[in-house]
């Protein structure tokens, strides 16, 4: 699959914005964009984000190595200052590297395809994100994080085992 990116925070002026990038080969750009060689995964790193040696912003960066990531792929997150200008420059940078803008639900779709989550969890996550009341949070959260998800996973495992035998 291609390398995709998305703004994970609203596209409005704020203190910070977060971009998520995922896909095979995305880590190949870390040295070029951030000036880091072989950074450790799962550590928050402070570094300069550049486009062709032109400084854009001092950002936070976290790398995730697949399959130990949400999508199951190599990925990284960029924590930048939340000005609209910075967001625009980051979008331009990612576009110039050939990254594709992720469609809505793309990261969850990749997590499902890579067996990181099941269908119930994918649907429950959507409900959880869309929840507008505390009742909706509790109901969708129970489905996503609670007993229902575990019971469905156990049931699915039993079906798979019975099909094998």
Residue map of PLM features:
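Amphipathic alpha-helical coiled-coil segments
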Residues: 144, 148-162
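Conserved small/polar residues in nucleotide/adenosyl-binding loops
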Residues: 165
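A glycine-rich (often HGG/GG-containing) alpha/beta subdomain
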Residues: 1-138, 142, 146
């Amino acid at each position: 699959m291609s390398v995709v990116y998305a703004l994970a925070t609203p596209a409005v002026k704020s203190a910070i914005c977060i971009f998520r990038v995922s896909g095979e080969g995305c880590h190949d750009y870390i040295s070029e964009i951030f000036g880091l060689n072989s950074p450790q995964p799962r550590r928050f790193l402070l570094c300069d984000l550049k486009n062709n040696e032109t400084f854009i912003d001092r950002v936070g960066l976290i790398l995730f190595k697949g399959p130990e990531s949400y999508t199951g792929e190599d990925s990284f997150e960029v924590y930048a200052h939340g000005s609209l200008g910075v967001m625009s420059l980051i979008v331009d940078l990612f576009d110039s590297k050939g990254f594709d803008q992720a469609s809505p639900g793309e990261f969850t779709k990749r997590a499902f395809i890579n067996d990181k989550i099941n269908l119930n969890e994918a649907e429950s996550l959507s409900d959880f994100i869309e929840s507008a009341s505390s009742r909706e949070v509790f109901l969708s959260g129970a489905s996503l994080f609670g007993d229902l998800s575990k019971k469905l996973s156990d049931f699915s495992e039993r079906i798979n085992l019975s099909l094998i035998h």
